[in-house]
Amino acid sequence: MKILKMMAVAALFMPLLFSCSGGSSSKNNLLGAIPDQYAQFVEEKAQIKKEAENIKTAEDKKALIEKSEKMTAKWKEKIEESAKALSGKPIEIAECNFNVTEPMSLEFDDFFSKSDLKPKFNIKGTAIAKADTQTELNYVLKSIPVYLVGYDAEGKEVFKTKAGYVDVEDVNGKAFIKANTPVKFDPVRFGESDIEGSKTAKTYKLEVKE
């Protein structure tokens, strides 16, 4: 009887255990299924490239080209579907020097490269500088880049992509950001170098890198 009671209690708490343990990982999964899909695409593409080294006839070449085109079309469809699924999904931004005033999300636009299948996104939403900020960056242009930076569970930077820029002023030769200055978002793209980082990142921030 005691064992049955313990099993019943465990069953009651099982959903709670699963929701707590997996919550933060899926919640901050910036690119959804894309990293795994892109990794498989890159692997298959490398295999076809290896096969090309052994081409001996025109028929072999034609067959391999058809295989490559079919493989690319397959992954284009899958990656595009996953990219479109991210539309409207909020990007949770951790405490940083910018305030998100309208929820940020990725909206699929197109592919930067049709052969490499690097998806391009527009960033929706708005963010502004939280306070006056004196950077250590030399004042060169009237704006400086703002990056979307991802950190793993230990706080190590594992992902970084240029998200846009923010206007600055010249204060003693250094770039100065005035409070409430909006970030002007640029299209962002995802490529092979981002695969591992986007999978391990747990938190994201908007940052000016010095």
What is the meaning of each model-derived region?
Residues 1-8:
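Bacterial N-terminal signal peptides that target proteins for export
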Residues 49-64:
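Charged, low-complexity interaction regions
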Residues 17-19:
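C-terminal motif of bacterial Sec signal peptides marking the signal peptidase cleavage site
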Residues 138-146:
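Short coil-to-beta strand junction motifs in C2/discoidin
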Residues 21-23:
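Bacterial signal peptide processing site
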